[in-house]
Amino acid sequence: IFRNNQPSHAVPGGSTFNTLISLGRLGVPATFISEIGKDTVGDIIIDFMKKNGVCTENLDIFCEGKTPISLAFLDENNEARYMFYNQFPEERLNFVWPRIEKDDIIIFGSYFALNPALRKKVCELVEFAKERKAIIYYDPNFRDAHAHEAVKLMPSVLENLEYADLVKGSADDFNNLFHVTDPQKIYTDHIKFYCPNFICTLGSKGVKLFCEKGDKHFATTPVTPVSTIGAGDSFN
């Protein structure tokens, strides 16, 4: 994390990762499925997960390549701009499948759920979870860094929406995907056909919930943020 273009501190993170860490701290059984390099950064992340009660048994720990790193640059309003660096092996996401039961919750999203190199295995896992009658929660978390790929990735985005029992995303996510920020238009034009349950977060303007029975707006309490990193993940 950088403030005034100077490194401030480094911590493990990522959208779904942050959500599971919060659940682990609350004592909720949580398993993280992803890929991590067999290196110092990877060791730090695994140790952090264990200390926060998140299961690491289903990680793919690879030897050829390096654990990915994200840089977050905070502006004067503590809003974050991101840059990503990675070096993955040719063969990806060779994880041990977890036990999935009815009403378990599967959270998936971000570019990880759209990446062509991982797409087949992500779909296999989500389809298996649906067969087991798990609840599928999709958080697009579609950042500015991938906005130029929106058209190319759209078939996978729409397929993810169709998988989902609940879609949650920020107005910024959907602006990057569909060039729309109005929650009603996002739901009516882009979400409802695929998934009836939708939550749109609007930062300081609150949260809008849509479902088959109607919609409702929830106001937020004004705060001065320390930073916006992981705000949506905390909402999850």
What kind of feature is each model-predicted range?
Residues 1-55, 224-226:
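Glycine-rich phosphate/adenosyl-contacting loop at the front of the ribokinase-like
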Residues 4, 83, 104, 177, ...:
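Residues that scaffold the ATP/ADP-binding catalytic core of kinase and kinase-like folds
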Residues 23, 170, 232:
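Short, conserved phosphate/pyrophosphate- and ester-handling motifs at nucleotide-, phospho-/glycolipid
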Residues 29-110:
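Conserved N-terminal subdomain of the carbohydrate kinase-like
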Residues 30, 56, 134-136, 198, ...:
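Hydrophobic anchor at the start of a short beta-strand
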Residues 99-101, 160-161, 192:
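A short, aliphatic-rich alpha-helical micro-motif
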Residues 111-188, 196, 206-207:
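Conserved beta-alpha-beta core of the PfkB/ribokinase-like small-molecule kinase fold
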Residues 127, 183-236:
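Conserved phosphate-binding/catalytic region of the ribokinase-like
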